[in-house]
Amino acid sequence: MFVDKTLMITGGTGSFGNAVLSRFLKSGIINDIKEIRIFSRDEKKQEDMRIALNNPKLKFYIGDVRNYKSIDEAMHGVDYVFHAAALKQVPTCEFYPMEAINTNVLGAENVLSAAINNKVTKVIVLSTDKAVYPINAMGLSKALMEKLAIAKARMRSPGETVLCVTRYGNVMASRGSVIPLFINQIKQGKVLTITEPSMTRFLMSLVDSVDLVLYAFEHGHQGDIFVQKSPASTIEVLAKALQDIFDSKNEIRFIGTRHGEKHYESLVSSEEMAKADDLRDYYRIPMDGRDLNYAKYFVEGEKKVALLEDYTSHNTKRLNLEEVKELLLTLDYVQEELKNA
């Protein structure tokens, strides 16, 4: 599906960029691709990636999604875009909400506009469960990013740039996530700091995140949102699973929720569930293609939203301690940390 095509990954030196490039390299897909452009701000991370992967198909572009000119110029000749650049740390965005807006909203506007201007065939925008019923600045900014993508999708004519969204749950062992934090605390003999023991989070692997984006790329139509069904765990069970894996007796301390944290996350709202397609492993939420003349649609009717539940980390499959341990042991990151323990 990428034969002789040029692909751009914004924020390409991050967790997702590394995961998708690893997939392409191991599977041989990269041999079919004309070029992959890594667009990001950090020259050191780009240099590290260039040396580590050492592949002539990879081209590196220094730039910032906040700067329209830099993203527009880098996108000349691009066929497909995976937009992963974002500020994603919830507490940080709470303290610096304008920075979240500048990157996650205005930056996304720049990426989408540049893609349309350069006649890119398809853009996959990476979002988060925190965009559903958002209570924090990061989630609000990502929700607006989704709205931008859908609004622009609604205005596209057949044959123009296709814009799709993917929503992630918690991506295990991604940069800045709780699993690396717990493992570091365990290995350093420190107290494990748990915010709220009964708090639940979806558990997705980086492999799952790549699967979701590639599924959306292959099957997505204009304005679609895709969600992967994922199991969940409480934070306490996750911490205890890591203790067992690393044979740790570290003390656990409950420190209370951080700024902007929710007790549980939602991947699909009840309103979206009313129109979502169940695709076995995924939900597809089609774009609401109506215009502002609602009267002509009234006779069509719709499902009663009040009768539907949103899809949350509380009502999805809940993993017990042994199941969480089994899942964690499938992660390359955990295996590497065990070797170095």
From Swiss-Prot:
Transmembrane segments: none annotated. Its EC number is 5.1.3.2. It catalyses: UDP-alpha-D-glucose = UDP-alpha-D-galactose. The keyword Metal-binding does not apply. GO terms for biological process: lipopolysaccharide biosynthetic process. Keywords: Isomerase, Lipopolysaccharide biosynthesis. It comes from the Bacteria. One of its GO terms (molecular function) is UDP-glucose 4-epimerase activity. It holds the Pfam family Polysacc_syn_2C. InterPro entries: CapD_C, NAD(P)-bd_dom_sf, Polysac_CapD-like, Polysaccharide_Synthase-Rel. Epimerizes UDP-galactose to UDP-glucose. Belongs to the polysaccharide synthase family. This is UDP-glucose 4-epimerase. It comes from Rickettsia conorii (strain ATCC VR-613 / Malish 7). The gene is capD.
